[in-house]
Amino acid sequence: MKRLISCLTIICALNASAAAETTSNPCSRWISFLKPVCQRIHQTWAEGHDDMYFSGYAWHNRYVYSNEKIKSYNETAWGGGLGKSLFDEKGNWHGLYAIAFLDSHRHLEPAVGYAYLKTASVNKDLKAGLGYSVLVTSRVDYDNVPIPGALPWAALFYKRITIAATYIPGSSREGHENGNVLYMLGKISL
């Protein structure tokens, strides 16, 4: 519950910060080479559609984990969250999100981040995208310390519905297995 409140506090702080900035030059205090990053994040927040995220599956790589270990893991990573997203002038997707889900040990794991996908249109309603996400998360097994990360991300967009996946790399060292998880999530643009 504390982590959920922390995520909501971060979202509210970002919203208050965005509202406090002047609309004419919201990134004026950023270092010059980071201004494009600020401007894209601000554009996504200000012009993006509201999104509702849901998750439900985390596949643990069968080539890394034993059957016994897999049976002990939670692969139904139920959770959800909120976000903002938009397709830019080139048709590529940008998203800001805050989600929480049940991790492999059935503990609540929050994450907030930004994602970018280079997209290709299959037809008018269907797009495919490949890109990355940069995020901050925290886990019980790491004493709930905020952990920054970057992950690959792929998605299929159909009208307002999106199915996305990321692969969390890890170690397969005997007795120290972690990561190596395909995490699936969905999104509905409201």
Curated annotation (Swiss-Prot):
Pfam families per the UniProt record, alphabetical: PagP
List the subcellular locations: Cell outer membrane
Signal peptide interval:
1-18
The record, for Gene3D superfamilies, names: 2.40.160.20
Task: Name one molecular function that GO assigns to this entry.
Answer: acyltransferase activity
What is its quaternary makeup?
Homodimer.
Per its record, how is this protein called by name?
Lipid A acyltransferase PagP
- Tell me the organism: Legionella pneumophila serogroup 1 (strain 2300/99 Alcoy)
